[in-house]
């Protein structure tokens, strides 16, 4: 089914964190995206765990698949993305689930870097499109400016479902100093964008408060993908305090607020998604 049509009648449960879960599960500090080439079964296993937990939507392991983070030329980044798409498809293996091309921020330093990054966002999006991916998830951004040209250009060439989510702190402001209200309004004003919302940055309780204050865009699908909670370093391990049961309870509040797309970011695991999936009402639309 077309994702737009599905979301008109049913909420969507996504996967949870990849990077923090990869680090904890495999006890490594390696960049997770490198495993698309070097450890494909490890990547596939995580996708499968989320699907088995109840996710109907998984994001490719490509959040940091860019030239700056991988320190490779774009030809190698392209291979990394292509491998990630194939791994995700192998994991889905006939299940009724969507695959989204995951695109995170490219680190920049100055106007020249920003211009290069804007072009690379388009090249990344095009690579996904050429692989047959029709859903793109631009996540954890501090503003819209850097990715907007790529979104408009790729949508002029391919039929895409575009998701854009921003990361804000508990006070509702991004690293660029922009409020959640402005970020959501700016993204909602772009015709090419289908879904807007927040991810990372805060736990589910603060995310509900921020979205309630910011207001939810009426003509776009709303996504809410919070962290498990707030991290603490214990015995050299990054830990998040909230339990899967607590997370699921708070996600009910986000669903009641009108969120159409619900999932988890840093610190969440398949157990978090599984706990959320157990509640029958999570898929119901709030009218």
Role assignments for model-derived ranges:
Residues 1-287:
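Domain-level signal for soluble alpha/beta catalytic cores
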